[in-house]
Amino acid sequence: VANARPEALRAAITPRTKLLILPYPNNPTGAIMDRDELQAIANVIRETNIMVLSDEIYNSLTYGPDRHVCFAEIDGMKERTIVVDGFSKSYAMTGWRLGWAMGPKELMRHICKIHRLAHGLCLRPQGAHP
């Protein structure tokens, strides 16, 4: 992800592009982008109607003097970004599968509806399995 090239991103976007998935910081290196690199990506996004899904689960696992900047903090990106994060990586809670998402209110309302239907245990079949 580091050293992202705006021209390559711009060239990859087609009329069918709806979402940019931004796994940042990157695993396993902890590589991060500085604010200027994120701003360059945001400038390309502003030219389109696409949303950004920013996977920031490794945000506290960065090394060196630079710190993580949330993509939603970049001017004009808050209303176009869904940030997903969790506790398992930063707090050594592997296996707990605890996470969260934040984004534009109306979009999150729909995401929560889908989550309620799609996430959960099907107890009857699991209870019948030896």
Show the residue positions of the predicted features.
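Short, surface-exposed helix-loop/turn micro-motifs enriched in polar/charged residues
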Residues: 1, 49, 118-122
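Active-site pre-lysine segment of PLP-dependent enzymes
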Residues: 2-16, 28-51, 58-93, 106
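Residue-level marker of structural boundaries
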Residues: 18, 38, 116-120
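Short acidic, glycine-rich surface-loop motifs adjacent to enzyme active sites
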Residues: 20-21, 27
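Hydrophobic residues in well-ordered beta-strands that form the structural core
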Residues: 21, 52-54
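Conserved core segment of the aminotransferase class I/II
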Residues: 74, 78-130
